[in-house]
Amino acid sequence: MYYLQMYEKVLINTNITRPYLARFTKYQYLCHMIFYFSGTGNSKWAAKTLASETDDKLVSIPEVINKDCSFTLEKGEQVGFIFPIHGWRVPNIVKEFLTKLTIKTEAGDTPLVKHYCFCLVTAGDSIGKAMERFLQQLKSTTVGDSLSLEAVCSLIMPESYVGLPGMDVDKKEKELEKKELASKQLKEFSKIIKQRYPLGNKQIWGWEQLKRGPIPSFFSGPVGGFFERFLITDKPFHVDSRRCVKCGICANVCPVSDIKGGLGYEPEWIHNGKCLTCFSCYHHCPHHAIDFGKRTQKKGQYFYNKLSK
C-alpha cells in the first residue's frame, strides 16, 4: 500500500477501475500505483487503460508534485510511470517529481529488496534516448534505492506538438491508425505487467523494442537541449480577443497552473518558468483563440477524445 500525506486533495478508491479525487481528506491508503502526467490526453488514456487491466491506482503527478507526499510500499507492490516525451526527453515536471518522490518499504524488507517498476511513454513519432535518461535519473535519486525498472514500453500516439514549422496534428486516418496500434500494444504490455515476466540477466522487458527513431543520441542530446532552452516557454502564447469567449477552459487544463484566468476572464500567462509547452491550452480551446506566436496559425487541434478534422 502507499501512504500519501496531502492537505487539500487525495486520490481515493471508490471503484476498482475508476479512481477519483476527493477534497479535504487528509490521509488515504492505497496499493499498486501509477504516477502519470498528460497534456493532451494520450498518456492519460494509456494510464487509465492500463490501470483498468492491472488494478493499479492512478496518481496524477501535477496533483501531488507540490504536496509533501510520502509513499510506503508493502512487499510485492509495484509502481509505474506514464508520461509523454517532450523534445525527445523526459518532461521537466516528471524530472522534478522524481527528485521529490520518496518511497519507503515496509519494515520487514531489507535494503536489497526492490519493488517492481515499469515505465510507459507516449510520443508522436519517436522517443530518442528519453528512456535511458529516465533510467539514469531514477538510479541517481533516492527513490531509485527502492525501485527496479523491469519493463518499458513506448506508444506512438497522435501528434500534438505544433510549435515548429512543418509540425502539425495528424490527419483523421493517421490518428485512428495510431490509436488502434497503440491499443494492441498496450494490451500486450498489460499482460507483461500482470505476469511480471522475468527475463533474468538484468534485462528490462521491451528495452530493445522502444521506438527510439534515427540517431537517437543526437535528438535527445543537442536537439533536446535546444528544445529545453529555447522552445519550452510560455512567452509566445497569446489569445485572440475576438475569438475568446472567456470560458476558462485553458486555465483549467494547464497542468502547472501557468495561466491566470477562469470563467469570465481572458487567459493571461504568468511566465513563472513552469510552462511545459504541452499545448494543452491551445488544443483544448473550443474557439481556437490561442496561438503560439505565428507558428500555430492555420494548424489543427488535438486532444485524445476529439478526432482531428
Question: Positions of the model-derived regions?
Answer:
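Iron-sulfur cluster-binding cysteine motifs and their immediate structural context
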Residues: 239, 245, 249-276, 280-297
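Short, positively charged and aromatic/hydrophobic N-terminal segments
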Residues: 2-3, 7-12, 19, 23, ...
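Active-site-proximal loop/hinge segments that shape catalytic or ion-binding/gating pockets
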Residues: 302-307
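Residue-level preference for short coil/turn positions at secondary-structure junctions
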Residues: 28-30, 74-76, 112-114, 233, ...
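Acidic, Ser/Thr-rich low-complexity intrinsically disordered segments
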Residues: 215-256
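FMN-binding flavodoxin-like domain, especially the glycine-rich phosphate-binding loop
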Residues: 34, 38-46, 52-65, 73-83, ...
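Detector for intrinsically disordered, low-structure N-terminal pre-sequences
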Residues: 9-11, 21, 58, 142, ...
